[in-house]
Structures are given as C-alpha cells and as structure tokens.
Curated annotation (Swiss-Prot):
A GO biological process held by the record: regulation of DNA-templated transcription
Keywords from the UniProt entry: DNA-binding, Nucleus, Transcription, Transcription regulation, Ubl conjugation
Gene (UniProt): IDEF1
Region of interest called Disordered, as start-end residue ranges on this chain: 30-91
Function summary: Transcription regulator involved in iron deficiency response and tolerance. May regulate directly iron transporters or other transcription factors involved in iron-deficiency response. Binds specifically to the DNA sequence 5'-CATGC-3' of the IDE1 element found in the promoter of the barley iron deficiency-inducible gene IDS2.
InterPro entries the UniProt entry points to: B3_DNA-bd (IPR003340), DNA-bd_pseudobarrel_sf (IPR015300), LEC2-like (IPR044800)
Coiled-coil stretches noted in the UniProt entry, renumbered to this chain: none
Protein name: B3 domain-containing protein IDEF1
Organism the protein comes from: Oryza sativa subsp. japonica (Rice)
CDD domains reported in the protein's UniProt record: B3_DNA
SMART domains (alphabetical): B3
Length: 362
C-alpha cells in the first residue's frame, strides 16, 4: 500500500480515505460522526472532486503493483461550483461504507488485491444494520405463522457458495443476529402429515368355562363341579343299583380303609389277590395311569397304579388318591369299591361310608 502518485494534475500523497476510516473505527480512536445535520454556515465550501483511481499494473507474472489514488482536487476553473446539501451524518459514508459492508460480510469469495481488515463482529453488524435498517420488519406475524413460514423456507446456510444477501439469514453467529430471532419459534424441519399408527393387536386370551382346575392333576371334570355332590348323592342308590342290575359292571375290588390309607400321602394299599386278578398287569415298576369314573359325580379320576417289592412278593398301591378321599369325606373304616366293565375295560370307583351300629344300655 502506498501513497498517491501525481496524476491528472498532480497532488500530494494521501492515505486511502476508506481504509483510514475503517482502521479508525476498528481501533476506536475516532468517535462516530454526529448523525444529526450540522448547522449551515454563510459561506459554502467549495465542492471537492473525489477521484478514486485504482491502477493495477501487472509488470510481469511474478510482480504485481497495486496503486490506489485518492485525492481531493480544487474546483475546476472552467465551471462554477454548485451548492451541496448539508452533510447528513451517515449519508456521506456511501462510498466508504459500501466497501466496509462488503469487507465485513465477506460477500465475495473471488480473489482480489484489497486488504481485508479483521473487524469485530459487533462493528460489522452495527454498520450493516444502520445501512439496511429499512429492510428489517417493524412488526412480526403470529408465532404460528412464523413457524409455518420458516418451516417451508429454504435456509440460506444450506445453499452452497457465499451469502446472496445481507439479510438476517446471512449472519450465522448468534451474537451478530438481531434480537428478533429470540421471538421466533425453533425450526424443526418441514411439517409433514403424521402417519396413521396401526393399532396394536394384543393377544386374545380365551378362557373356557368347561376347563376347570383342581388341586391335583388326577381329577378330570366333565361338565359339573364337586359342588353338586349333595344333589348327586340323592340318586346314588338308584344309579348304582341300575349299573349292577344291568350286568355291564361287576365288583372287582373292595377295600376297607385304614389310617395309613386316609393319611396325607393319599396312598391306598390294595389287596394283592384282587389286584392281580382284575387290574391290568404291571410288567415294570413304573406306575400305570388308571382312569376311573366316579359313581356319584361326573368326574374321572386319574390314579397311579404301581407295586412295591416286599420279600419276594409285591404290594400293590393306588397312588394319588388323596383328592378322591377328601371329596367324598372318607375316613378310616370306610370302604372303596371298584367296578369294571368287562367289554370295553372301563372302571368305576365308589366311596361308601361305614354304618356304625349304636348299642344302647338298658
């Protein structure tokens, strides 16, 4: 950077007007001019002629000379100076501030020989706002309108290349943007119609009233429950008599219960002779499941039929009989009777209370 050479009438060397002004603003050594009009004086100063000459002399490929000439010449003697309006503060900065704004906003990315000063963002934005203050709106629409407008607008920061305008969108730093940005709702992207969510299909739980659980797995109900036991006992004699008289079923086993039979274990020891003669043969020690219909209740009982070795002999046991004994209220001294249908091989079991004869003293 040099001083102005003599040209077009000569003149002394002066530093660049706009560069000196920018440096003074950056260093805060010169106060800002008064924005109000200055009082007019009686004598009108001569109108200066501002000649800005930018000469780029490329003498060769390696050497480049940049001469910037700026001088204030005296009024030409051939014409009479015309009166100029009173300075209006920032209006006289038209030549300087245009360069100032272009340097501050860095609107052009093309290489140039101009010297770029490192200006503070606050000065750059202040000058930009004073020059373009008419571009900012004085009122803002409702928040929901701003949201729709901003959501559908293309963001300048997404576009490639330099900023195309000096609006608020060209400032990416929050400190350089005006306070109006705080009143705008956040931009969450374009508004799209929400997809209808498919209703969740929950697994259907099906409960059957016919399936009833008992405390033991050895009981199967047909359609009635044990609560019908008192009513069913009314036809006990008639049904038993009918079955016996029909000849389809015959008694194959009769056992008087002992204290060990009605214990908590629920295990009934069967007579060896009757068990081997009428019940299915046991070839292994593994239990055999026997299904027996109740004589009184519409229930099918599942018993485990097994044997225990006993001194080169066998002891036959009807296991899992605790629920059957409890349902009929059988105690020691009562009797169980097992019936068998010879043709299909079905079994029927019956519990009978013992009859105690009471003797009275004379």
């Amino acid at each position: 950077m040099g001083q102005m050479d003599g040209g077009d009438g000569g003149g002394g060397g002066h530093p660049y007007h706009y560069q000196a002004l920018l440096a003074a603003v950056h260093q805060q050594t010169v106060p800002f001019p008064n924005p109000f009009p200055a009082p007019s004086s009686g004598a009108e100063p001569p109108h200066p002629h501002n000649h800005n000459h930018n000469h780029n002399h490329n003498h060769n490929i390696h050497n480049s000379h940049n001469h910037n000439h700026n001088h204030n010449a005296a009024p030409h003697p051939c014409h009479t100076p015309t009166p100029t309006p009173t300075p209006r503060g920032f209006a006289d900065w038209s030549a300087s501030t245009s360069a100032f704004t272009s340097l501050a906003a860095h609107s052009s990315t093309a290489p140039s020989n101009a010297v770029h000063y490192s200006f503070s963002p606050c000065y750059a934005f202040w000058t930009h706002y004073m020059l373009n203050k008419n571009a900012y709106p004085t009122s803002f629409p409702a928040p929901h309108d701003d949201h729709l407008r901003l959501a559908n607008n293309n963001h300048p920061r997404d576009a490639p290349g330099p900023a195309s305008s000096y609006g608020v969108e060209s400032f990416t730093s929050p400190s350089m943007a005006p306070n109006i940005c705080t009143h705008m709702p956040p931009i969450e992207g374009p508004i799209s119609a929400k997809e209808d969510k498919k209703p969740e299909i929950l697994p259907r739980v099906v409960k059957s009233s016919d399936e009833l659980e008992t405390r033991n797995s050895n009981v199967e109900f047909h359609s009635e429950t044990v609560g019908t036991l008192p009513e069913s006992k009314q036809g006990h004699d008639s049904r038993a008599t009918k079955l016996l008289n029909s000849g389809e079923y015959q008694v194959i086993l009769r056992k008087e219960l002992t204290k060990s039979d009605v214990g908590n274990v629920g295990r009934i020891v069967l007579p060896k002779k009757d068990a081997e003669a009428s019940l299915p043969p046991l070839l292994q020690r593994d239990p055999l499941i026997l299904h027996m219909d109740d004589m009184v209740l519409p229930v099918t009982w599942k018993f485990k039929y097994r044997y225990w070795p006993n001194n080169k002999s066998r002891m036959y046991i009807l296991d899992s009989a605790g629920e059957f004994l409890k349902t009929h209220g059988l105690q020691a001294g009562d009797v169980i009777i097992i019936y068998k249908n010879l043709a299909p091989g079905k079994f029927i079991i019956r519990g009978e209370k013992a009859i105690h004869q009471q003797t009275t003293n004379p």
